[in-house]
């Protein structure tokens, strides 16, 4: 753990990255944000912070800047896919910068974000499927393979950590450490 905190030789070679999803909601009625809201947010992020648009079927479905991207998830969740970085401090800085940019843009629209794993109050019908061909295909497939697939797509978020590894044994070691510290991380947050 200490090696990744301070950027030891191993972590200078190997990189870590995070994927951070969040739900947007309107402050006035605590309802989910719409596709139109997301289009405004993404457009303003481009103009104010120099993100580049990713377009599909004339809709902005994501943004990119250097090795970082912001994507639109099936139920309107917004995800930061971070760049590969040297240590946890850099990924923390990256997530904080993203949240600061998002908050600055969304303040004008009275939109805020929450980091919650699952939405207990909003129903599937409250969350419109986002305009990505992939999600259209997934939304037809998920009900065929289980009862909660659509809920997973539209009503959940996660934070994922991605670790480079040099070999299978290196991957096993990192996986064991990550699993061992997971209860501590959960307790902290």
Q: Across the structure, where does each feature detected by a protein language model lie?
A:
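Short beta-strand/turn micro-motifs at beta-sheet edges
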Residues: 9, 66-70, 147-151
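Short secondary-structure junctions and interdomain/linker hinges
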Residues: 9, 48-52, 109, 145, ...
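A generic structural signal for short, non-catalytic loop/turn and secondary-structure boundary residues
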Residues: 15-18, 56, 63-65, 73, ...
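Glycine-rich, often proline-containing surface loops adjacent to acidic residues and nearby aromatics
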Residues: 18-23, 72-88, 153-164
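Active-site acidic/histidine clusters and adjacent loop/turn architecture
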Residues: 30-120
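Loop-rich catalytic cores of soluble enzymes, especially ATP-dependent carboxylate-amine ligases
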Residues: 118-189
């Amino acid at each position: 753990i200490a090696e990744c905190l301070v950027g030891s030789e191993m972590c200078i070679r190997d990189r870590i990255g995070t994927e951070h999803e969040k739900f947007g909601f309107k402050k006035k009625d605590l309802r989910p944000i719409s596709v139109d809201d997301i289009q405004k947010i993404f457009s303003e992020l481009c103009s104010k912070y120099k993100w580049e648009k990713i377009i599909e079927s004339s809709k902005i479905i994501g943004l990119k800047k250097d090795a970082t991207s912001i994507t639109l998830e099936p139920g309107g969740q917004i995800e930061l896919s971070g760049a590969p970085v040297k240590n946890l401090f850099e990924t923390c800085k990256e997530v904080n910068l993203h949240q600061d940019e998002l908050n600055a843009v969304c303040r004008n629209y009275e939109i805020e974000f929450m980091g919650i794993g699952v939405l207990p109050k909003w129903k599937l019908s409250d969350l419109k499927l986002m305009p990505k061909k992939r999600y259209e295909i997934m939304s037809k497939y998920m009900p065929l393979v289980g009862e909660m697939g659509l809920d997973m797509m539209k009503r959940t978020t996660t934070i994922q950590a991605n670790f480079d590894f040099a070999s299978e044994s290196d991957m096993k070691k990192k996986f064991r450490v990550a699993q061992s510290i997971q209860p501590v991380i959960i307790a902290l947050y």
